[in-house]
A protein has these predicted regions:
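Aromatic-lined substrate-binding rim segments of carbohydrate-active enzymes
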Residues: 24-31, 39-103, 232-240
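Short, acidic/polar
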Residues: 18-32, 123-129, 251-261, 330-338, ...
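Polysaccharide-binding and catalytic clefts of secreted carbohydrate-active enzymes
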Residues: 101-292, 296
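An acidic-aromatic substrate-binding cleft motif
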Residues: 1-22, 29-36, 283
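The substrate-binding groove and active-site-proximal loops of carbohydrate-active enzymes
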Residues: 9-18, 43-58, 105-124, 149-153, ...
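Conserved, mostly hydrophobic/aromatic
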Residues: 11, 30, 38, 67, ...
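Carbohydrate-binding surfaces of carbohydrate-active enzymes
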Residues: 195-198, 230, 242-243, 273-276, ...
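Short, well-ordered coil/turn segments that N-cap beta-strands
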Residues: 5-9, 34-36, 68-74, 136-141, ...
Length: 677
């Protein structure tokens, strides 16, 4: 795929929203401002098939031919997120339903269900016609499947979903006896004696379902979305030229994005809206990372696809007329946020959208241009970003210079979605590790653990955190043991290993399958009550916060106690241990990796401030390293409305201005510097 071999800029464009007289001037203005790709079509089903079976592609033929003649590249979206009125009215079984089983009505988007045979038939027909008609068009470089799979809702509760769920379960368990055992249906007399008795989780008397059913249901939702995506991809590839790529945009919940990226798509793309970190009615909080927090999501995206694209990069104020209110990017923020994406691995950045829509639900979801279509500050910033992107082309294809990894599995991701005990600690640790890494300028990767993950993939990282592997499998345990035996450091947190893959709690002490490696047994555990003071421990003479959840650990012979509680009813009990395994070691922390705790781990494990000899910077700026063929680059990003001072330890080349810099350097408000090191 040639598309990401150079960094480039794009924009989302809706030719169906505008008079054709604007098309040519719009495209020329885009090109004049450094925009070379447009995404189109993802909501335009009714333009292509106004009545059932009546396909008319002449509208987009004219636009695509104009793109070809002007030199504009096109990413064409399949418009399956917005079925036309004739379809949903004639075939109501294609609609999704709410928890009470009531069908959604026409008039929004993403109101269909993935499992309706009729919907899949209509989608397959349309996508096939599109691919056959445009699969060799010279302007098209790629295709986007649907739009934002699992956005708006990731619950699918229609009759078609219920039927498909039962088929999914029959394939997985083969017999009701196996299902009843895995789900523990003996509890509350939930035992099933006929497959037809099982349904997707509709409203019940207690607003609570069997957690093992819910875990399998979330897996089913993901499998349904992936099947829907794969169906379209397979159809496209029958007709499109090999030079064209297939992608989709995300990232949303109850979806195995890693599986989709690796086995269905050519490249993964993300929609980045940093200003949603602000609440319009909130006051500024210095401890909050605000728009800088988007780097957490970009780090997740990088685990899905190391070299990804941004399909929708925020360019203006955001919101629907009835919900969501995000303010206009201040001068400099538009380019800052785009560079934030590039710093974390994006080699393509497409802004949403070219011109703000004067009609419809998204009249406040501003584009680069306002309703009046005049040149403005935001367009000038887009042009400046495009020019700056050319100055750093040498960074294209570089990996992120991650100093440690945070392990994740899809089972634990889905379990944390349905289990509040798991979800609370998981979210707290992910947020805490991210904040600590930001404050200590320590880039990290999320590392997805799969059945086919190879040991060398883990050995890239001297330290791996597995914060809360509630669900732990034997093959995962074996891989982690091999990693440690070869010299790696594994750090685990509380609530590790107390469930199997079905969500059942095996009758064995925590940390379950890792007990042999940790040499510990969990004796006591509890959430911290809001009425209680936060527990503390002491590690290497410094305080270690134990917040949110507390465990006391019983060490075996050969396991060293590194920290004990100094407060709470667990005072004196071990909370942090270390055990040597082969050439490596395992640290077991009986708590959550809050910001303070995670920062203490990064410092004590020698991970914090990896670039401090080159760049000394306040924790108010972000530093991200990228590396390729032995060459490294540092992105220094200032998210604040005032300049920040950094100190360069040696002479470095600033790529954006071509100057050499050393000593004290000022990073202006809402600005970025890129250094070759």
């Amino acid at each position: 795929m040639d598309f990401l071999k150079t960094m480039s800029v794009g924009v989302c464009y809706y030719p169906e929203h505008w008079d054709e007289s604007l098309w040519e001037s719009d495209l020329k203005r885009m090109l004049d401002n450094g925009i070379h790709t447009v995404r189109i079509g993802e909501f335009a089903w009714s333009i292509m098939e106004r009545e059932e079976g009546s396909f008319d592609f002449s509208f987009f033929d004219r636009f695509l031919d104009l793109c070809a003649s002007t030199g504009m590249q096109v990413i064409f979206g399949t418009p399956t997120a917005t079925p036309p009125a004739w379809l949903t009215c004639r075939y109501p079984e294609t609609l999704n339903a709410n928890a009470d089983g009531v069908l959604y009505r026409h008039g929004g988007r993403r109101h269909y269900n993935y499992n309706s045979p009729v919907y899949r038939e209509k989608v397959a027909l349309l996508v096939g016609k599109m691919a056959e008609h445009w699969g060799r068009h010279p302007a098209i470089v790629g295709w986007q499947i649907d739009n934002e799979l699992n956005c708006e809702t990731n619950d699918f509760l229609s009759e078609a979903d219920g039927k498909a769920f039962r088929v999914f379960l029959q394939k997985k368990y083969a017999s009701l006896d196996a299902l009843n055992k895995a789900w523990g249906t003996v509890f509350w007399s939930q035992t099933y004696t006929d497959w037809e008795q099982i349904d997707v989780p509709h409203t019940n008397a207690i607003a609570s379902h069997n957690p093992s059913l819910l875990l399998d249901y979330v897996r089913f939702v993901s499998a349904s979305a992936l099947s829907f995506c794969a169906m379209q991809t397979e159809i496209l590839r029958k007709f499109i030229e090999p030079r064209m790529f297939v992608t989709t945009n995300g990232m949303f919940g109850r979806l195995d994005n890693h599986e989709m990226a690796r086995n269905i798509l050519d490249v993964y793309m993300y929609d980045s809206y940093p200003n949603f970190a602000y609440g319009i009615d909130q006051t500024w909080d210095e401890d909050s990372l605000h728009d800088r927090h988007s780097s957490l999501d970009l780090t997740r995206v990088r685990s899905i696809c190391p070299h990804f694209g941004i399909m929708e990069q925020q360019s203006g104020a955001n919101g629907w007329y009835n919900r969501m209110e995000a303010s206009m990017p201040r001068p400099g923020q538009l380019e800052l946020w785009a560079m934030q994406s590039v710093a974390h691995g994006a080699d393509y950045v497409s802004f949403f959208r070219w011109r703000t829509s004067p009609v419809g639900t998204e009249i406040y979801w501003h584009g680069i241009l306002d309703y009046d279509s005049r040149d403005n500050r935001r367009l000038r910033e887009v042009k400046a970003f495009a020019e700056d992107l050319e100055k750093i082309q040498e960074v294209c294809g570089a990996d992120t210079d991650a100093r440690f990894g945070v392990l994740q599995t899809v089972d634990n991701q889905f379990d944390a979605d349905v289990d509040h005990w798991h979800g609370r600690v998981q979210k707290a640790s992910e947020e805490g590790i991210f904040a600590a890494a930001q404050e200590t300028h320590t880039t990290f990767d999320f590392v997805d653990l799969r059945q086919n993950t190879k040991l060398e993939e883990l050995e890239r990282y001297p330290v791996l955190f597995a914060p809360h592997f509630v669900i732990l499998k034997e093959e995962e345990t074996a891989l982690l043991k091999a990693y440690v035996e070869q010299g790696g450091t594994l750090v685990i947190g509380c609530r590790t290993g107390y469930k199997d893959a079905s969500g059942r709690c095996p009758m064995q002490p925590m940390p379950g399958l890792l007990r042999e490696m940790t040499g510990t047994t969990v004796e006591e555990y509890t959430f911290r009550s809001p009425a209680e003071d936060m527990a503390e421990a002491e590690w290497n003479g410094r305080k270690l916060h134990v917040d949110c959840f507390m465990e006391s650990l019983q060490p075996e012979e050969g396991t060293e106690v590194l920290a004990r509680y100094t407060t709470s009813y667990l005072k004196g009990e071990p909370v942090l241990t270390e055990r040597t395994v082969g050439k490596g070691r395992v640290l077991h922390f009986g708590g959550v990796f809050t910001r303070q705790a995670a920062r203490r781990f990064l410092k004590n494990l020698g991970l914090a401030e990896p670039y401090e000899d080159l760049v000394k910077a306040p924790d108010t700026v972000e530093i991200v390293g990228r590396v390729k063929d032995g060459q490294k680059w540092l992105f220094v990003l200032n998210y604040l409305p005032e300049a920040q001072e950094i100190r360069l330890g040696e002479e470095l080349v600033s790529l954006l201005d071509g100057e050499k810099a050393e000593g004290r350097v000022e990073i202006p408000a809402y600005s970025v510097a890129v250094y070759r090191i």
